[in-house]
């Protein structure tokens, strides 16, 4: 069973657990435009759902991780179950042949998983299958070929053993960052689908640890927390955008990954969230003009853990989690539904990016007053792979002291 290794993330993981059920659904056809565009729209829709659930919490998730897991499931889905997944992933079924979607994911995963000396970015897909279950030949071949998925026979009649096996796979793939993801597997589980993404990058322009000091971060009108604030002065890709009433700062990692930070003007977070579009994000990511700036950015570790059944239900993906699921393309031994869908992503932002950077870069700076960019209040960020325009992670920092 061939598999190139998983997606290296600042650690994002998606786990879908399938259980047995009775019943089925009806018939469907094809999906949308190129993968990155659909992923950007999917990320946007999912972000909106998460902010509606709570506009005071940190948010962090990996759109590419969740979409990859769902696209794999769609290979074995039929009827409305199939249509809902592809529409929910923002594929316009009149604009792209379904085969092109899966080929697109295959190319994307291949590009993301290319070995880089500058950063680590790895994705992985694991199928944990009850020993009593036989996968359909076509599904088994397709997930291996298109999604580089590995299949593992699993004894689900011993849930504790099965949990241990799945968690060990995830822990290894995320280099120990995500542990004990799966707890309390239900007794009717027969299939678990796990996708992880792991990213570790180094800033192209690292911050100097000596300049990091404790400073206030204004969570809201009534709450201030103390955080280690990193500082660096230099030439940055940064500008103010009046459409979203926010400062935009691009910080590059070595290699071709960039973080796009969005700092709303005073009281304008809601305006930013309402006006930001995938098209604007693509436009920002291509900006190259630089300005002399004084950047203050909090050191932080942020994570998000989401129940996908709940979140994706808001995007119209409901059948696959219910008695209406038709996953007969995966196996005909028994009717399946996803009994549990989990996504966990985590990220650390520090002076080095993540790994120590020994070199110090000297740059020529103008004799002018630098623009202050103080990330000392809630902000948004996106981590984007430049070679493919793919949104790897999306985050919102409301309180950097909350893990």
UniProtKB/Swiss-Prot annotation:
Molecular functions (GO terms): serine-type endopeptidase inhibitor activity
Cited InterPro entries: Serpin_CS, Serpin_dom, Serpin_fam, Serpin_sf, Serpin_sf_1, Serpin_sf_2
Cellular localisation: Secreted
GO biological process, one term: acute-phase response
Pfam families, sorted: Serpin (PF00079)
Signal peptide: 1-22
Site annotation Reactive bond: residues: 367-368
UniProt induction comment: APF rose about 2-fold during the acute phase reaction.
UniProt-listed CDD domains: serpinA1_A1AT
Residues listed as glycosylation sites in the UniProt record: 55, 92, 155, 222, 256
Domain notes: The reactive center loop (RCL) extends out from the body of the protein and directs binding to the target protease. The protease cleaves the serpin at the reactive site within the RCL, establishing a covalent linkage between the carboxyl group of the serpin reactive site and the serine hydroxyl of the protease. The resulting inactive serpin-protease complex is highly stable.
The protein's role, per its UniProt record: Inhibits elastase, chymotrypsin, cathepsin G, plasmin, and trypsin.
Family (UniProt): Belongs to the serpin family.
Protein name, as recorded: Alpha-1-antiproteinase F
């Amino acid at each position: 069973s061939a598999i190139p290794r998983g997606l290296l993330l600042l650690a994002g993981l998606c786990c879908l657990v399938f259980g047995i059920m009775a019943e089925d659904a009806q018939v469907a056809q094809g999906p949308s435009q190129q993968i990155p565009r659909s992923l950007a729209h999917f990320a946007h829709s999912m972000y909106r759902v998460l902010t509606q659930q709570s506009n005071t919490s940190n948010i962090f998730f990996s759109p590419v991780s969740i979409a990859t897991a769902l696209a794999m499931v769609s290979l074995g889905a039929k009827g409305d179950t199939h249509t809902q997944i592809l529409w929910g992933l923002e594929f316009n079924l009149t604009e792209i042949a379904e085969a092109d979607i899966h080929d697109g994911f295959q190319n994307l995963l291949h590009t993301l998983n290319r070995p880089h000396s500058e950063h680590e970015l790895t994705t992985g897909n694991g199928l944990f299958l009850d020993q009593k279950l036989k996968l359909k030949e076509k599904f088994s071949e397709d997930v291996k070929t298109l999604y580089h998925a590995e299949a593992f026979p699993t004894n689900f009649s011993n849930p504790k053993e099965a949990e241990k096996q799945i968690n060990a796979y995830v822990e290894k793939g995320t280099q120990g960052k995500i542990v004990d993801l799966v707890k309390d597997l239900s007794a009717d589980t027969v299939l678990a689908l796990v996708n992880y993404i792991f990213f570790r990058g180094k800033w192209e322009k690292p911050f100097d640890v000596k300049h990091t000091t404790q400073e206030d971060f204004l969570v809201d009108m009534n709450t201030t927390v103390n955080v280690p604030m990193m500082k660096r002065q230099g030439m940055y890709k940064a500008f103010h955008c009046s459409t979203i009433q926010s400062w935009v700062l691009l910080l590059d990692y070595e290699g071709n990954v960039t973080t796009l930070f969005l700092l709303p003007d005073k009281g304008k977070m809601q305006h930013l969230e309402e006006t930001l579009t995938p098209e604007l994000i693509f436009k920002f990511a291509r900006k190259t003009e630089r300005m002399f700036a004084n950047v203050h950015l909090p050191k932080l570790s942020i994570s998000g853990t989401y129940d996908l059944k709940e979140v994706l239900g808001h995007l119209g993906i409901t059948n696959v989690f219910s008695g209406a699921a038709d996953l007969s393309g995966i196996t005909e031994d028994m009717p399946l539904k996803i009994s549990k869908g989990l996504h966990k992503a985590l990220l650390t932002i520090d002076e080095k990016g993540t790994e120590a950077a020994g070199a110090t870069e000297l740059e020529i700076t103008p004799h002018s007053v630098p623009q202050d960019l103080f990330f000392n209040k809630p902000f948004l960020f996106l981590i984007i792979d430049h070679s493919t325009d793919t949104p790897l992670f999306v985050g919102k920092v409301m309180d950097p002291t909350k893990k």
